[in-house]
């Protein structure tokens, strides 16, 4: 499976990992807020 534009593929991968990182930070923030305000 040869990609016509491997650079674009890496950019999409970085964007996906960025979204996963933001989602992880959001979940951790919710868990910590529930822990501190409970």
Curated annotation (Swiss-Prot):
The keyword Iron does not apply. It comes from the Eukaryota. GO terms for biological process: photosynthesis. InterPro entries: PSII_PsbL, PSII_PsbL_sf. It is a single-pass membrane protein. It is found in: Plastid, Chloroplast thylakoid membrane. This is Photosystem II reaction center protein L. The chain crosses the membrane at residues 17-37. SUPFAM superfamilies: Photosystem II reaction center protein L, PsbL (SSF161017). PSII is composed of 1 copy each of membrane proteins PsbA, PsbB, PsbC, PsbD, PsbE, PsbF, PsbH, PsbI, PsbJ, PsbK, PsbL, PsbM, PsbT, PsbX, PsbY, PsbZ, Psb30/Ycf12, at least 3 peripheral proteins of the oxygen-evolving complex and a large number of cofactors. It forms dimeric complexes. Keywords: Chloroplast, Membrane, Photosynthesis, Photosystem II, Plastid, Reaction center, Thylakoid, Transmembrane, Transmembrane helix. GO terms for cellular component: chloroplast thylakoid membrane; photosystem II reaction center. Belongs to the PsbL family. One of the components of the core complex of photosystem II (PSII). PSII is a light-driven water:plastoquinone oxidoreductase that uses light energy to abstract electrons from H(2)O, generating O(2) and a proton gradient subsequently used for ATP formation. It consists of a core antenna complex that captures photons, and an electron transfer chain that converts photonic excitation into a charge separation. This subunit is found at the monomer-monomer interface and is required for correct PSII assembly and/or dimerization. It comes from Anthoceros angustus (Hornwort).
